[in-house]
Swiss-Prot record:
Family that this chain belongs to: Belongs to the TRAFAC class translation factor GTPase superfamily. Classic translation factor GTPase family. IF-2 subfamily.
Protein's name in the database: Translation initiation factor IF-2
Native source species: Listeria monocytogenes serotype 4b (strain CLIP80459)
Region (G3) location: 338-341
Biased composition (Low complexity): 82-93, 118-170
GO MF annotation list: GTP binding; GTPase activity; translation initiation factor activity
CDD domains: IF2_eIF5B, IF2_mtIF2_II, mtIF2_IVc
Entry GO terms, CC: cytosol
PROSITE patterns registered for this protein in UniProt: G_TR_2, IF2
Subcellular location: Cytoplasm
Amino acid sequence: MSKVRVYEYAKEHQVSSKKVIEALKDLGIEVANHMSTINENALRQLDNAIDGTNKKAEAPKKETTSNENGNSKGPNKPNMTNSNEKSNKPNNPAGQANKPATANKSQGAKPATNKPANTSKQTQSSGNQQQAGGQKRNNNNNSNRPGGGNPNRPGGNNRPNRGGNFNNKGRNTKKKGKLNHSTVPPTPPKPKELPEKIVFSESLTVAELAKKLYREPSELIKKLFMLGVVATINQSLDKDAIELICDDYGVQVEEEIKVDVTDLDVYFENELNEAVDESKLVERPPVVTIMGHVDHGKTTLLDSLRNTKVTLGEAGGITQHIGAYQLEIHDKKITFLDTPGHAAFTAMRARGAQITDITILVVAADDGVMPQTIEAINHAKAAGMPIIVAVNKIDKPQANPDRVMQELTEYELVPEAWGGDTIFAPISAKFGEGLENLLDMILLVSEVEELKANPDRRAIGSVIEAELDKGRGPVATLLVQDGTLNIGDPIVVGNTFGRVRAMVNDLGRRVKKVGPSTPVEITGLNDVPQAGDRFVVFEDEKTARNIGETRASRALVAQRSATNRVSLDNLFEHMKAGEMKEVNVIIKADVQGSVEALAASLRKIDVEGVNVKIIHTAVGAINESDITLAAASNAIVIGFNVRPTAQAREAAENESVDIRLHRVIYKAIDEIEAAMKGMLDPEFQEKIIGQAQVRQTINVSKVGTIAGCYVTDGKITRDSGVRIIRDGIVVFEGEIATLKRFKDDAKEVAKGYECGITVQNFNDIKEDDVIEAYVMEEIERK
């Protein structure tokens, strides 16, 4: 007998090569892999080992088969197919005997006709038991012999052998076996116990609620329907529906309110709502805002209080920034905010009223109540702040304080002397009269208001002013409203963030920490914030950076969406805007407040047919990138209290960009308004330049009617328009076709001269008609 490879032996015995290798190793025969050869002696030992294993495995299989009506079920079907396929191989060794009788023994009295799979299986078992001599076995019993598969089957020798794979009864038997195995129904899983409490935020879908309650969504939909709520699996449920379902199951419900940590207003609301230990609160200085009409003496009043010349530093004597100063009077501090009185600073005054405690309304005794005075009253009332009226300029001869009091009663500001509750303090800011009384009134009102703050918490407050300093970078003037601000604190200011590097008070001195109601100038931010933004100090720099970057990205997205947003409501406005001319403007200023003021004023310019489009605003000097943007968008650059850099000036000359520099806001507004009026379509006015009387008419073929005229008034020009007037009625209006003096063409014919005139597209000229000549002159728009 020749040697056999491991994989060939495994294939003949229908076992894996791995199993054969393991069996050889158990016998002490080492083989390398499935391609190794097995000698005859090893084959005999391996046959005995494999036969012993098969006998042990066959015994329970036979027992199982006999318990199920003595039939071998469908799982043996692949073995039968393999046997039939092997029977067609020509390499079966001669002398190998087939054992059909073994199949009959294992099946008892039942004929083998109905069990082709069993025949193959039992034949293999018999063949394995009789291989003691080491000879190769033939696993096929019948396929090489006609009719040998089952001698008891009628016509068995005449029917072709299909190997059992296409036997319908075999298939049915297999199906029956499957049905018999699945007769025991699976035990349904027990539902999980209900939770004691569920937590949700805003709303839940039916599927999400079912998951939280460990129940099927269909069960919840049914319960909702019984409760009168029709819902689908993906439908969101409101709080009431969730509570109804959970109450039916006996589960508690808790709604979780998510707080947006990037919303700085939340920190201010929490300060108002949370209960504070009274022992930690200390008295804080009052924040006083000085309001009033332009040139009524607000800055002069503050100048007198501080004994400085603040007014001299303002261009044109007009306050154009918010100034914050702190004074110490009678061992008590008062913080003053000096807001501009010009109408352009309405937004700044409104912002000042929101962060103030007391409003001082300055009214000139010689001027009375003015428009900005009324506006300041409305701001203070809207903020709910107490008002102290300072009647200024009482030193002037034409001063009339009683008239001021009378006018203010119309706005519900009744003096205490007249039975009201408004404090009136007559003063002269220029000469310092009545200032002591005014300061006493401020301290009195602050005591009544009981202004307190907690200095032990992290600081929160508002931005009074912001600017870009060339040497220090972004600089912001902050008013600490609560808590204490220290150097090194991580801070978020509006949409900017950073760490406080340095702090300078209103006197220009460096400080390490500031308490409530104290103005301070800080550096260390990554960008210039907006005036009026709120600031919050956080625990660590990482949190501040994340919140600041998130707020900046949201602001950028909101800005982009706002500029491009179109709805059905404003669609027609957008369509109309396409027909309107625009003045593109870039505004650069020294501080953010001036940028806002100038932008607001330019937007209010009401010139028919022209819009002001502010495409960019920023704080700092005019740089080269501003010129590039202006050149691309055909814009005018307005610099307010700033100058262009050398590179920017050179770029502006190369790109022919118009740069306008101003130090007083009135001049900037007037200049832009004048430029806008120049951009309007020209306005024309008709001007009659002369009249001529028709004395004779001549009809000429191919030319028409020629009117022989005498100029009675003014002159007739070649390019003028004409009207044909007959009996005082205009019968035609058109243009002159030809104008001749004798036989020569003439540009104009003066009074007292005769001429020949033909009119375009009109030949019905008659004697005694009057030809009136006129021109359209462009006039300046007002």
